[in-house]
């Protein structure tokens, strides 16, 4: 006997949902820069690669898992990755060393930042919408209704 499994629109894993391509691009670019940092060797680059990998995994979990706790804090990986990539870019500009692969990694990180801003506008409508959801998730306001 075969059982047919169908997904409804409110379950995770539906690849037709809006924004899946955007999330996929963010995750792919994040894993790419993680790989670049991992191949450079040294503890600092290795830890940077681990951080990027963890944030990529968090983005996937938020995109796929419809658990209420995950959805309550779905803003956290976006802000975390935004801050992490920004800090990595700033540290590179201050410390160096400047070489071609480093600039490639920074270009990828700028692309990550750009896609994250687009994702924040897609999901929350504006940075203010993200702030409202973040505050509401810790009990300091009312969460806005979203269709995505």
Label the predicted regions.
Residues 2-148:
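Membrane-interface extramembranous regions
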């Amino acid at each position: 006997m075969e059982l047919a499994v169908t997904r409804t629109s409110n379950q995770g894993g539906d690849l037709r949902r809006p924004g899946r391509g955007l999330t996929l691009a963010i995750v792919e670019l994040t894993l790419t820069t993680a790989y670049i940092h991992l191949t450079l060797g040294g503890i600092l680059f290795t830890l940077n690669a681990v951080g990027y990998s963890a944030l990529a995994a968090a983005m996937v979990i938020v995109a796929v898992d419809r658990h209420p706790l995950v959805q309550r804090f779905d803003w956290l990986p976006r802000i975390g990755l935004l801050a992490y990539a920004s800090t990595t870019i700033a540290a590179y500009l201050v410390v160096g060393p400047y070489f071609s692969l480093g600039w490639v990694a920074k270009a990828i990180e700028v692309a990550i930042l750009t896609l994250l801003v687009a994702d924040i506008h897609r999901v929350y409508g504006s940075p203010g919408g993200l702030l409202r959801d973040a505050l509401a998730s810790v009990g300091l306001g009312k969460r806005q209704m979203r269709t995505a």
